Amino acid sequence: MDTGVVPEKKSRVSSDRRKEKSRDAARCRRGKESEVFYELAQELPLPHSVTSNLDKASIMRLAISYLHMRNLLSTDNEEEQEEREMDSQLNGSYLKAIEGFLMVLSEDGDMIYLSENVNKCLGLAQIDLTGLSVFEYTHPCDHEELREMLVHRTGTSKKSKEPNTERSFFLRMKCTLTNRGRTVNVKSATWKVLHCSDHVRVHESPAEQIPGGHKEPSVPYLVLVCDPIPHPSNIEAPLDTKTFLSRHTLDMKFTYCDERITELMGYDPEDLLNRSVYEYYHALDSDHLMKTHHNLFAKGQVSTGQYRMLAKRGGFVWVETQATVIYNNKNSQPQCVVCVNYVLSGIEEEKMMLSLEQTEDMRPVKKELEEEESSEPEVSPVLLKEEKSPELDVIKLFTRAVETQPLSSLYDRLKEEPEALTLLAPAAGDTIISLDFSSPDSDILQKEVPLYKDVMLPSTSDKLALPLSLLPPSDQHLVPNTSVDTTEVSTGPDSSSTPGSHSFTEPDSPLDFCFPMESDINAEFKLDMVETLFAINPEPKTPFTLQAMEDLDLEMLAPYIPMDDDFQLRTLSPEEPLSCGPAQPLECSSLCSSVRLTQEVHSYPGSPFNAPGSLTASPALAASPALAAPEPADSPCPASLLTKTVPQMDREISLRSLASQNAQRKRKMSLSQAVGIGGLLQDHPGPGKKLKVSELSHADAPFNRTILLLPTDLASRLLGISSEGSGSPFTLPQLTRYDCEVNAPVGGRQLLLQGEELLSALDQVN
């Protein structure tokens, strides 16, 4: 029986028909979907070349993004929706103006919009990123910070009624562009730092409410302008004059700075080296910059935004900096920080001092002003009254100015009294006013002696110094560069009438003992004066009181201590007045004539150290009457002439001047030529006295000479005046055992104790 076979065939045919119908229905359905997606793609604001190649998923995400953007941009005001002509013209320039690209994020982090120039910054197409989540293309370490930026917190507290909608942060996104401009796969992409800044924009629901009575919640959108930070090695455009480069260590200390900072801010590049950049930040911007530097070392690049940087001489300038961390190619460790600094303004508030660095330049100016104020002479009220009077007495003006300012110059007085200049130069026919220089005030000014000055400085005293006797004519062949004119001391009319008056005053420093000489030995002689003839003046130096030498206890006075040489300190005893026979009255003709300070008595040929009164003469010559030339009894001694006209201290000055001249001659000539005798040792009479004696080298020498090589601190005692049983008006000082053992030469001048050796020897003796 064939009854069971036929139903099986019918069931197979029906199932195949159903499947075919199902495939046809699905195919029709897919066709309709494709038509719908095609129509939907045509509605997207994209070119046809782009939309024709989109898949359904891309069309859907692009459509959703478009709807979000429409929702964000929709407003109730129809007037604002009308696009103006100016806006249409500027729309094409907005993207060119910004260096980066525009990105709009939804509350969930979806990129609902990106501008077309994102491809130039990241190498990714706009269509490939729109509608996707931003977390898929950002660095995992930045996700938490990004979520915080997406959250829109409404102001619930009373203090903040309006929430802060501004955002500024740094985001690392994938970049498929290489340094050469090529595009790589997304899997091989690198991280690029973007400075994202803008605000949160909230879309409010329309006024109508849902039938249930609930209002739709507001939808926040994060609108960002993403600016990439260029690497310093990839900067193509040349930097302008308002931009300077700097390199820093990892603790932000300067290691290099461009020279253009000098014109912009006043700093020299050398002044900034090894200095922290935080020293030059405005205090109000320090916190912001510190956070920025944290981002720098965490993400590799940063842009500081606008901040204030201090100028050198006061004030500040607005600066924006793009900083980049440079990594080592071998171990990928950070090495340094390179900054591109853009100066946005000039120096503002220049007079405002904001740090101690800015006040250093002001200190010299303040000191200058203080010195100028202190140097201005004070005019007494009497002088002020004299100025108001129509006629000025020039003599009283100068004498009173001397009382108020004894050290002021004539120029300073005339500058303070300009009306006196008209009286100093009278017109034709006027009576010439004679200035009286014999007033008591001028005598007081000459008697006053200023304090000790620095021996290394030239004297600035205007007082008279005694002229010095130069070499005799017989010694001209020894020192050819020295002037051979004999300098004489002439007495004025005042000194002839009043023998007790002071015709000369003492110089301020030992350098005033110098005499005119050639320029080639002038500097050398001044140095020799400092080294060999520096001695403490026995007269007390004070501008306030004048006392006689015999009334002072010099052991109680503090001597002048030089700071640059090792001089032996000792006290000086008061000197006896000079006696050289009975003083004879001076005639007017002798007073007007010149008196020679040195005499050539039994002179050895060619030797300036041969006079009995010479400081370096032999004791045998001074003590033996047979060797010394007899002096006429009626001829007055030069020292007695000085006692008639010059005080005791003025005589000592002339003797020091002679010693300074002889010291220069010894410096220019050899010792044997200056003395003219050979070396010969001879003991000086007296216990404990050891002297260095030279011996005659010539066979016809009639006598021996003793040369004393003493330390410079004995110069004042060598110049001392005494009359104790000596045929010569000058006697040699009494040398102690201490002086001879420490300072006497033992084998030539090269074996003298110098510097530290002399100090150690003094310490052992003490």
From Swiss-Prot:
GO molecular function annotation: DNA-binding transcription factor activity; DNA-binding transcription factor activity, RNA polymerase II-specific; protein dimerization activity; RNA polymerase II transcription regulatory region sequence-specific DNA binding
GO biological process, one term: intracellular glucose homeostasis
Source organism per UniProt: Oncorhynchus mykiss
GO terms for cellular component: cytoplasm; nuclear speck; nucleus
Protein name: Hypoxia-inducible factor 1-alpha
Protein task: Functions as a master transcriptional regulator of the adaptive response to hypoxia. Under hypoxic conditions, activates the transcription of over 40 genes, including erythropoietin, glucose transporters, glycolytic enzymes, vascular endothelial growth factor, HILPDA, and other genes whose protein products increase oxygen delivery or facilitate metabolic adaptation to hypoxia. Plays an essential role in embryonic vascularization, tumor angiogenesis and pathophysiology of ischemic disease.
Low complexity: compositionally biased ranges: 490-503
Subunit structure, as described in the record: Efficient DNA binding requires heterodimerization of an alpha and a beta/ARNT subunit.
Sequence ranges assigned to domain bHLH in this UniProt record: 17-70
